[in-house]
């Protein structure tokens, strides 16, 4: 999966969230066993969002392998389905609704679970003696449930790390990737080559508009929790949040200032193309996901490159190796009358080691079970292994689910835009106001 974080967050609206919460509960309850466990022929419908040729081919291969194991269960696969379309179908219910749905948007798990449109899988996991905590990496398990409701399971993951231009490193006299933020800042400055009012090469683009340099991705290096035990936003009281904003703004100043950086950023090409600024050499270091390794190999860039975990705060140096994680989720429609067959399919895709590994290898994503991460069948060159190690790291984290999706992240991001640009100058006051905004929005969504 490629990262959809920015476009997903910017698409969030309170109206859409309220509409989902207000209408989703009209779906019918499941009718129990569909007879598939006794050999009855059953056809289930699976909606997913993948569209690229290698992705579609990989899905078809996994479905064929499943149908070979379960000859009486047939899977009708429908691809390139957006979250909006699947949400509408699940709200409406009926015979045209899918039985199994996948989503690239882990931010939506909270509303999927709380709106009762995806079935709680806990009873099915218990029935088949599957211990989720012993099966899935902790961050992936965390982003697939909400308040104990395991309404989805991880189906491959994404991990974020550091990409660095080894050729540029050598020219700057840097012999190893940075591990702490102070080392990172020093290297970013060394790697920056000014050119008039712009740059011939920038060490790193730190602004929040810089593709994957979102507040949530930076905060993953701090282990920020976003909410306290009472469910209220803790971004104003958690010192790691203020520390991140202070660090990011300081790095902006060291690299030439916000206006100069934003002018340079305006010349960047599309993130998911060979015009990506890391691929063109416009930036020497980049924060990105595991999928970039395949793109760099396919695009035959003109320099040597490597990957490493993204640096961590100096006072958390022992956590080096951690990273932010997200991924794809899959669940069963609460309204489906074929949940027995649907569960067999979901269980196969998410817990069968061969299925997880083959799918991960085919689309170059991180495997989403502990067994698959440890499998020797995973195709992992040194660059990709970095992301497998990040996924295994006990300090890696994700953004928690919320009843109104990723709206709280959007609030933090919007404040970040104002703070980095100098439109907001009082950090603590801004964080307090943002926390209040988050709490109010969550209360309204309940």
Show the residue positions of the predicted features.
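Conserved N-terminal structural module of periplasmic/extracytoplasmic solute-binding proteins
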Residues: 2-111, 115, 127-132, 268, ...
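Hinge/lid segment of periplasmic solute-binding proteins
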Residues: 104-159, 219
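Short, solvent-exposed loop/beta-turn-alpha elements that line the ligand-binding surface or hinge
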Residues: 122-136, 195-206, 224-244, 298-300, ...
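Long, aromatic- and glycine/proline-rich binding clefts that accommodate carbohydrate-like moieties
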Residues: 138-139, 360-407
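Extracytoplasmic/periplasmic solute-binding protein
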Residues: 146-155, 160, 182-242
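Extracytoplasmic/periplasmic substrate-recognition and gating elements
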Residues: 172, 253-259, 297-362
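Glycine-centered hinge/linker elements that transmit conformational signals in sensory
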Residues: 188-189, 233-266
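C-terminal capping/gating helix-and-loop segments adjacent to ligand/active sites or protein-protein/ligand interfaces
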Residues: 385-436
């Amino acid at each position: 999966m490629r990262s959809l974080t920015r476009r997903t967050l910017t698409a969030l609206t309170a109206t859409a969230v309220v509409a989902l919460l207000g209408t989703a509960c009209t779906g019918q309850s499941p009718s129990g066993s569909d007879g598939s466990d006794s050999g009855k022929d059953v056809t289930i419908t699976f909606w997913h969002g993948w569209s690229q040729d290698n992705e579609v081919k990989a899905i078809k291969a996994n479905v064929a392998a499943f149908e070979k194991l379960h000859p009486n269960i047939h899977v009708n696969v429908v691809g390139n389905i957006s979250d909006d379309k699947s949400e509408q179908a699940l709200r409406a219910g009926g015979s045209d609704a899918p039985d199994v749905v996948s989503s690239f948007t882990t931010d939506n798990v909270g509303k999927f679970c709380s709106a009762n449109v995806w079935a709680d899988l806990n009873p099915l996991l218990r029935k088949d003696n599957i211990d989720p905590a012993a099966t899935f990496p902790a961050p992936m398990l965390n982003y697939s449930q909400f308040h104990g409701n395991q309404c989805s399971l991880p189906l491959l993951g994404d991990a974020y790390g550091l990409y660095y231009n080894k050729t540029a490193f050598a020219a700057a006299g840097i012999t190893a990737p940075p591990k702490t933020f102070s080392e990172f800042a020093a290297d970013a400055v060394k790697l920056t080559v000014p050119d008039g009012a712009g740059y011939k090469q920038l060490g790193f683009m730190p602004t929040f508009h810089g593709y994957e340099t979102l507040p949530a991705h930076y905060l993953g290096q701090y282990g920020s929790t976003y909410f306290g035990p009472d469910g209220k936003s803790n971004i104003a009281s958690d010192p790691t949040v203020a520390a991140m904003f202070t660090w990011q703004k300081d790095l902006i100043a060291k690299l030439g200032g916000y206006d100069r950086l934003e002018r340079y950023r305006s010349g960047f090409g599309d993130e998911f193309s060979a015009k990506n600024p890391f691929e063109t050499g416009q930036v020497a270091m980049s924060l990105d996901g595991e999928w970039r390794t395949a793109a760099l190999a396919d695009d035959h860039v003109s320099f040597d490159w490597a990957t490493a975990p993204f640096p961590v705060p100096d006072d958390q140096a022992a956590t080096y190796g951690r990273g932010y994680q997200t991924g794809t989720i899959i669940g069963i429609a609460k309204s489906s009358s074929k949940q027995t067959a649907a569960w067999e399919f979901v269980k196969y895709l998410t817990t069968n080691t061969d299925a997880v590994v083959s799918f991960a290898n085919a689309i170059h994503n991180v495997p989403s079970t502990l067994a698959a991460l440890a499998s020797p069948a995973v195709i992992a060159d040194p660059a990709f292994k970095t992301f497998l190690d990040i996924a295994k790291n006990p300090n890696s984290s994700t953004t928690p689910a919320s009843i109104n999706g990723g709206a709280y992240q959007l609030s933090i991001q919007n404040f970040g835009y104002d703070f980095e640009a100098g439109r907001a100058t009082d950090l603590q006051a801004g964080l307090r106001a943002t926390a209040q905004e988050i709490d109010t929005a969550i209360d309204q969504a309940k």
